[in-house]
Design a protein with these regions (language model features):
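Non-catalytic C-terminal accessory modules of carbohydrate-active enzymes
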Residues: 81-180
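Catalytic cores of carbohydrate-active enzymes
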Residues: 1-53, 59-73, 77-85
Length: 180
């Protein structure tokens, strides 16, 4: 079925709806943005990016901790500053009573909350590399001030390895070579 959308009269912008019909919302997620992640129906490679941006801007719950997906969804929409803020927030939050810094939480699943770290890791990867079918897009949501060495996997047994300095790729290797 088509993704439910509507036009917002005062802005004349379209937005994604959580469902074709619904009564009241009963948890702290933004189901309308599932069309961005995990289903990837909207994004940088797809039509309707403005509609997805509007849905992200108007989401009811603005959170990046636990299993909240703002970090991933903002990266997939190319919103680099927002993705960077969410990723930093997730990685910097740790539980002071735990021996290991990566024992995030307590969020929704208590301690350790591995959803919290996995969301940050997926978002960080999508900030560096995104893909759709055979197409690869590098640095779609990467802040220019961040430098990084990376080695990431993409579909079709592809590995993208490189270095980014001051917003520019200074070293890149894609294997197999025909995927470059």
């Amino acid at each position: 079925p088509p993704v439910p959308t509507r036009c917002i009269p005062h802005t004349r912008r379209g937005t994604i709806l959580p469902a074709a019909e619904y009564d009241e919302l009963a948890n702290c997620e933004n189901p309308e943005l599932y069309a961005v992640f995990p289903y990837r129906l909207f994004g940088l490679f797809r039509p309707g990016i403005d509609t997805a941006h509007a849905a992200y801007e108007m989401r009811l719950f603005r959170k990046s901790g636990g299993w909240q997906q703002d970090a991933i969804q903002s990266a997939l929409l190319g919103l680099g500053d927002e993705a960077a803020r969410c990723v930093k927030e997730n990685f910097l939050e740790c539980h002071g009573g735990s021996r290991f810094p990566a024992f995030w939480g307590p969020n929704y699943d208590w301690i350790p909350d591995m959803d919290h770290g996995s969301v940050a890791c997926v978002a960080l990867q999508r900030m560096l590399v995104q893909y759709d079918g055979d197409a690869l897009l590098l640095l779609p949501a990467w802040p220019k001030a961040w430098n990084a060495d990376f080695r990431l996997h993409a579909p079709r047994n592809t590995v993208v390895e490189g270095r980014v300095e001051n917003g520019k790729i200074v070293r890149l290797a894609v294997t197999p070579p025909e995927r470059e």
